[in-house]
Structures are given as structure tokens and as C-alpha cells.
Amino acid sequence: MNVFPKKIMLLGSGELGKEVAIAAKRLGCYVIACDRYNDAPAMQIADQFNVFNMNNGSELKEVIYKCNPDIIIPEIEALAVDVLKEIEQKITVIPNSRATATTMNRDKIRDLASNELNIRTAKFSYAVNQSELDLHAETIGYPLLIKPVMSSSGKGQSLVKNKNELAQAWNLAIEKSRGKSNKIILEEFIDFDLEITLLTIRQSNGKTLFCAPIGHEQKNGDYQCSWQPAELTESVLEKAQQIAKRVTDNLGGVGLFGVEFFIKGEEVIFSELSPRPHDTGLVTLISQNLNEFELHLRAVLGIPIPEIVCHEASASRVILASMETTDVAFTGLEQALSQSNTNVFMFGKPSSTEGRRMGVAVAKAETIDEARIKADNAAQSIQFINE
């Protein structure tokens, strides 16, 4: 018998962690939110919070043993994963420590997909210094993408059009890299037709479920807008589902995975994977009967998922800060919410820098184009001000 409430520890308390915390609280769980800074979004929902460096193994271990959670849900990449492997013998880690370690570094998940599972990816190579970068760039060809092997939200990513831009791209990737690695990945630029996320849910009963595909656009590797359902042929969707299942089956565990693909014609090209709710999946806050965070919690807790329904054409658009401040204030909610079937979710971040993601607008309509226009209008209505 599954006894509730469960005590859940979130390692990472940003906007996605906040929505996980909300979903957990609605199921009666006790939530402990952890992050490196105070008043992070999920901490505003949680029963308890801890502020510390989660990359520090001894600090992480101390907090885990002090709080003694039933379940640990990593929500960010920058973690002392060796501790999770040790802790996993006593406490459930979602989806598991291996999946967390594999997906926190682009090289590990890319090697798994391409080399072990023989799944089509963009051509890629690695470099640990400028000389290797120059050599591999000539082999892959221009234009190409350069990324840190470990970063989040597209930080440190550059599109390089010729060799004269390599040095600047290298410096940016190293500067924005998380952790101690100076390793970067060079990646073939694919002139794709569409970029999608396939939310893939592994359940404790052994079954895998899929949400309707989500189309999205990025700027410098960072999510800007998404829409659901993305228009795919039946054969392309089937290929994407097969690949997502192969990779997530290899990683194991339970929960929701965000699996990203490039679509070019009938070709499906694996891009990246997150073993947790995905930022592009914020559109499910309006599009589905169960949003991605609720699906994640149900899978984690062993609660049935009878069906996943995508109600109608829906879209999201991020709300970005226009200034740096520690006293966040904004206007425009009245205008943003004057449209039907539209909502705004502000994340409650305690400070902003120019371009920081502070919220998301979501909308639904009869068509994807109409939903995207409504979401765009709502997001543009929010203006940040100095009080």
C-alpha cells in the first residue's frame, strides 16, 4: 500500500521546481526546497527550505541526512551526483542517480545516444583547448554550434559562421560552463524544419506514455516560445516516440523526461534530454488535462495516469526582464489577461537581470497561430519598472 504524505526534496528551486512543488502540495506531500540562493521560486511554496552549494558533496549529504526525505527530485544540472549515487541505496532518487549524471553533461548523453544506441544526432566532437577546437571545427564544417558540456538554459552557446569567430565562442563557452570542466562540444548546425520536445513519462507499472509533441523556438539555445500540438506526420511522430522510449528505457527510473529532437522532412534527429519537466512544457499549464508537473509527480509517486488529453491548440511565450534590479515590479497584468483563454504565470524570482526569464504567458485558441499571437500579446503587455 502506498502511504501518504511523502516527504519530497527538490534539488533546485527555480520556476520548474516551483510548479513541481505546487503539484506535490496538491497531492498532500511535504516539500523541502533547496537552492544556492534565498527566496527561490519553489521556496515560496515549500514547507521547508535550505540554501547551500549543491555542488559541494559534503554540504549536500549533510542536508539530505538532516531532512531525511522519502524522495529526492533533482531539478537542475549542477549537483554533486556522486552523493546521489551513494544516497540512492537508502533514498529514492528521481529518475535515478545514473540518469541524473548522464544528462547533466552533454557529452555523456550524446555519447549514449550516438555511440551506444546508434541514434541519429548532429555530427559532433569535443575540445578541451583552442587547438583542438580549431581542428575539429574544420572537420565538422561551418556553420556550427559551440556549447559547454555542462550549462543550462542555453548559457554559453554560440553559432559560429567562420573560423574568425572560434576564439570568442570558446571564451564564452568556458565562461558560462557550470562545474570545473573546460570541455566543450562542437556540433553540426542542422537547418531543421522544426524543433520539438516530446514529453515522455515512464511509470512504475512499466508503461511509457507520451504527450502530444511540443514545437518550440530558441534564441541562443534558450527557450522563447512553444506550442502544442506540433504538426508532425504520423511516421515522424512514431519515429520520435520510438527513439524517446529507447533512450529513456536505457536511463531507467520513473518520471517525466523532456526529449528534444530536430525534424527535417521525415528525418528525426536526437538533440538533448532532461530527466525532469522541461521549460518548453510550460505550455501544458493550459493545454492539457494534466500538466507536465502533475504527470511527473504521478509517475514519481506511483499514481495512475488514466489519460493525457491535449484540449486544443495552445502556446506559450516567455516574459523576460528588461532591467537589473533587486526590487522586481511590473505592470500590464490587466491588459495581458483581457484576452479569453489566456493566463500569466509570474515565477516570483527575487531579482532580475536584463533578459532573465521572469514569467510565462500561455493561451489557447482554435489554431496554433491564433494561440501564439495571444500568448505573444500577453507577454508583451508585462513591463518591468523601477519603483
Curated annotation (Swiss-Prot):
> Catalysed reaction(s)?
N(1)-(5-phospho-beta-D-ribosyl)glycinamide + formate + ATP = N(2)-formyl-N(1)-(5-phospho-beta-D-ribosyl)glycinamide + ADP + phosphate + H(+)
Query: What is the protein named?
Result: Formate-dependent phosphoribosylglycinamide formyltransferase
Pfam families according to UniProt: ATP-grasp, PurT_C, RS_preATP-grasp-like
Lineage from the top down?
Bacteria, Bacillati, Cyanobacteriota, Cyanophyceae, Synechococcales
Keywords, sorted A to Z: ATP-binding, Ligase, Magnesium, Metal-binding, Nucleotide-binding, Purine biosynthesis
Which pathway does it take part in? Purine metabolism; IMP biosynthesis via de novo pathway; N(2)-formyl-N(1)-(5-phospho-D-ribosyl)glycinamide from N(1)-(5-phospho-D-ribosyl)glycinamide (formate route): step 1/1
ATP-grasp domain span: 111-301
Q: How does it assemble?
A: Homodimer.
**What are the GO BP annotations of this UniProt entry?**
'de novo' IMP biosynthetic process
List where the protein spans the membrane. Answer: none
Q: What does this protein do?
A: Involved in the de novo purine biosynthesis. Catalyzes the transfer of formate to 5-phospho-ribosyl-glycinamide (GAR), producing 5-phospho-ribosyl-N-formylglycinamide (FGAR). Formate is provided by PurU via hydrolysis of 10-formyl-tetrahydrofolate.
Which enzyme type, at the first EC level?
ligase
This protein's species is Prochlorococcus marinus (strain NATL1A)
Task: Name the family the entry cites.
Answer: Belongs to the PurK/PurT family.
